[in-house]
């Protein structure tokens, strides 16, 4: 019923009341319309929560951004008309990220996900000016009253891939294409190496950095240089499938990263370490919808235990015995009985960084700037422990 119809109804009631009992009842008739108006407002469906995602790469990268966008789609499917989502891809880490984030606020989004490390300071700045908006920043460490830092334990997937790599290499030389030398990526390289060493102590790991998250030509060039240097199994912490495709062409082995990349190199593919962001995105969105979202002074971590990290599409080339070892590791990560970063662990200078039975906490893991024993070279700008 429109407001004009309500007014007509009110005047009709007034006239009828006046005819029956006189002028003393004139003020009651307009009041009778108010409950109907309030009921109509109460029954109207709530507007959907507007959610925006800022992506560092294209949604078709087959890796990192692809995984985030799959989770966005799953979020829409699960929550239906309670939410409406949008995304902006290829948002570079730099001042332009702030512009994009401010645009998202201006468009009325009340929950914004920034999905790469380099957005951190820009998101923190925007969050300070938009207190009615909730912000979620992936892989960073800074937080505020309306901004979370969240991360997946990708190093668990890296370790599991390493178990396979250590058992499959013939040359005992592994190659890793690194993206940006921040603790997250260094941690993954080290965890991959530790996993390989758990089944083959002779392995050593070579690393080539491209200093970008996604650049397929550079990724392919780096992969080829590692193959030329003697590596026969490749791993990556970059966002496209170029490393796997390079291994496929060379008749060597490699892994998928962040998403299942089997289709890009079915002969080379040994397994894919994948991230499922959906559980976290659904949980966080529900908290915003029902008003239970709360600040967290520390980063929120999700891994194998929470269903965020897995290793999938394991090749038939991987022997059953090696698969059994892998499944035991996965089970231990799931129930908490196994810790990847448990001492003794030494860096590649021979310095003990974790004593026997000492287990690294999340703060320690988030500050790794060294290579473990078995990884060649030095971390660019690192090696502080």
Stretches with model-predicted labels:
Residues 1-12:
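Bacterial N-terminal signal peptides that target proteins for export
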Residues 23-27:
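Bacterial signal peptide processing site
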Residues 44-46, 50-71, 75-79, 86-97, ...:
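Extracytoplasmic "Venus flytrap"
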Residues 72, 159-203, 207, 297-319:
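An alpha-beta-alpha
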Residues 108-116, 136-138, 229-238, 257:
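Periplasmic-binding protein-like
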Residues 128-152, 259-267:
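Flexible loop/hinge segments that line or gate small-molecule binding clefts
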Residues 150-172, 274-293:
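Hydrophobic alpha-helical segments within soluble ligand-binding/sensing domains
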Residues 290-385:
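Segments of small-molecule ligand-sensing domains
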């Amino acid at each position: 019923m429109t407001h004009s119809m309500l007014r007509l109804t009110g005047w009709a009631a007034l006239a009828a009341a006046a005819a029956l009992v006189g002028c003393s009842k004139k003020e009651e008739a307009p009041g009778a319309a108010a409950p109907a108006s309030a009921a109509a407002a109460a029954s109207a469906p709530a507007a959907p929560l507007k959610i925006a995602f800022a992506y560092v790469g294209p949604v078709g990268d087959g890796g990192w951004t692809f995984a985030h966008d799959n989770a966005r789609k799953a979020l829409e499917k699960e929550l239906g008309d309670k939410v409406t989502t949008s995304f902006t891809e290829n948002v570079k880490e730099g001042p332009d990220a702030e512009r994009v984030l401010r645009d998202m606020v201006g468009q009325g989004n009340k929950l914004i996900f920034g999905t790469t490390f380099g957005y951190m300071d820009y998101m923190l700045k925007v969050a300070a000016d938009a207190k009615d908006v909730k912000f979620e920043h992936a892989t960073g460490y800074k937080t505020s009253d309306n901004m979370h830092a969240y991360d997946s334990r990708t190093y668990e997937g890296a370790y599991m891939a390493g178990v396979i790599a250590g058992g499959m290499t013939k040359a005992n030389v592994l190659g890793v294409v690194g993206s940006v030398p921040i603790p997250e990526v260094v941690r993954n390289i080290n965890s991959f190496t530790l996993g390989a060493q758990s089944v083959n102590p002779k392995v050593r790991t070579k690393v080539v950095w491209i200093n970008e998250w996604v650049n397929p030509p550079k990724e392919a060039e780096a992969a080829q240089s590692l193959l030329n240097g003697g590596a026969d199994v490749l791993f990556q912490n970059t966002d496209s499938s170029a490393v796997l495709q390079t291994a496929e062409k060379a008749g060597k082995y490699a892994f998928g990263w962040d998403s299942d990349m089997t289709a890009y190199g079915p002969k080379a593919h040994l397994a894919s370490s994948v991230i499922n962001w959906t559980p976290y995105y659904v949980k966080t969105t529900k908290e915003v919808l029902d008003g239970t979202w709360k600040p967290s002074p520390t980063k929120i971590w999700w891994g194998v235990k929470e269903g965020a990290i897995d290793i999938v599409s394991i090749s038939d080339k991987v022997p059953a015995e090696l698969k059994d070892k892998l499944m035991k590791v996965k089970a231990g990560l799931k129930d908490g009985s196994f810790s990847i970063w448990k001492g003794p662990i030494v860096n590649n200078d021979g310095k003990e960084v974790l004593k026997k039975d000492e287990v690294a906490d999340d703060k320690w893991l988030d500050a790794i700037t060294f290579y473990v024993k078995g990884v060649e070279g030095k971390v660019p700008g690192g090696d502080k422990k």
